[in-house]
A protein has these predicted regions:
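An acidic intrinsically disordered interaction segment
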Residues: 2-18, 134-146, 209-215
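Metal-dependent nuclease catalytic regions and adjoining charged, substrate-binding loops involved
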Residues: 7, 63, 145, 166, ...
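Nuclease catalytic cores
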Residues: 13-14, 18-57, 96, 100, ...
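Short amphipathic alpha-helical segments and their helix-coil junctions
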Residues: 20-33, 80-82, 150, 156-160, ...
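Short acidic (Asp/Glu) and glycine-rich catalytic loops that position anionic groups and cofactors
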Residues: 22-29, 46-47, 152-157, 192-203
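Hydrophobic (often cysteine-bearing) scaffold residues that line and stabilize catalytic clefts
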Residues: 37, 41, 95, 169-172, ...
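A non-catalytic, helix-rich entry segment at domain boundaries
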Residues: 48-120
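Non-catalytic protein-protein interaction segments used by genome-maintenance enzymes to assemble
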Residues: 119-175, 180
Length: 263
């Protein structure tokens, strides 16, 4: 019998739903995917914007952004991280250019001077209907009426609705809204996904219906993970996304390696 993780996170639940075998390799077998170009790009952009929003509102300028980005790059290990990648999709200069373009696109989506943040990179640890959950919320903002808005920065593509359903797109933030309510009894009014590279903001209002649906996903996924751990059967979901999967690349996914014993 395999041992399931003690805690789940919104992202680990999302991974199990997209491919149970990938979840097993990452969270049970502990075979972690090494950092990639896209991972580093997203992390660097998140980090710089986090520090931008630590500035006093009137100091949240393009010039401040440049200084923060230069400092994080040179003095906090980012130059070494990016230069050390074995697979580079562009030059290091290209990485910096893409990152800075994504950061400056923030001004097309909101005005940092008047954006009122309640917190950033907030660790949340709670239980939803007996399912132990933990994770980190990118940021919590307060709307004009003081209501809570959970936001997430994205540096990748805007998902095509033909392939990504709304409940899948919003599940992680809805799960965080559930977790916040369990912790402090405060309700979240709205969710935001800020696609920085594309200058696109998607928003959705939080309703009791979509919260209830997210709660069901959490509980059912926990039950499915526990059952898979008992049986040892973690299905492989073979799709076009497999072409970008690290586990296929290193030949340990049973769907592509021909070794069914890896299941």
């Amino acid at each position: 019998m395999l041992i399931a993780p003690s805690y789940l996170s919104p992202s680990s639940i999302g991974l199990f739903r997209s491919c149970p075998q990938k979840f097993k390799l990452s969270y049970i077998d502990k075979i972690k995917e090494p950092p990639s170009w896209h991972m580093h790009l997203g992390s660097f952009v998140h980090e710089v914007l986090e520090y931008l929003y630590k500035e006093d509102p009137n100091e949240r300028t393009h010039e401040a952004l440049k200084k923060i980005a230069a400092d994080r790059w040179s003095n906090h290990g980012w130059a070494e991280k990016v230069e050390g990648l074995t697979e580079k999709l562009d030059t290091v200069a290209g990485f910096k250019r893409s990152a800075f373009e994504a950061m400056t696109n923030l001004w097309d989506l909101e005005d940092p001077v008047i954006t009122n943040l309640e917190g950033q990179e907030i660790e949340v640890l709670t239980s939803i209907d007996g399912v132990a959950m933990k994770g980190y919320i990118d940021r919590i903002a307060l709307d004009g009426d003081g209501s809570i808005v959970i936001s997430d920065y994205k540096t990748g593509k805007v998902p095509d609705p033909k392939y990504v359903a709304d409940d899948e797109k919003w599940f992680q933030l809805l799960a965080y809204a559930l977790m916040l309510k369990e912790i402090n009894k405060k309700s979240t009014s709205k969710l935001e996904l800020l696609y920085l590279s594309k200058k696109v903001k998607h928003t959705v209002m939080v309703t009791q219906e979509n919260l209830d649906n997210a709660r069901k996903v959490v509980v059912r996924t926990r039950a499915s993970i526990d059952e898979s751990c008992k049986s040892g059967d973690f299905a492989c979901k073979v799709t076009n996304l497999c072409n970008w999967c690290y586990y296929k690349k290193i030949n340990i996914c049973p769907a592509h390696s021909g070794n069914s014993d890896l299941r």
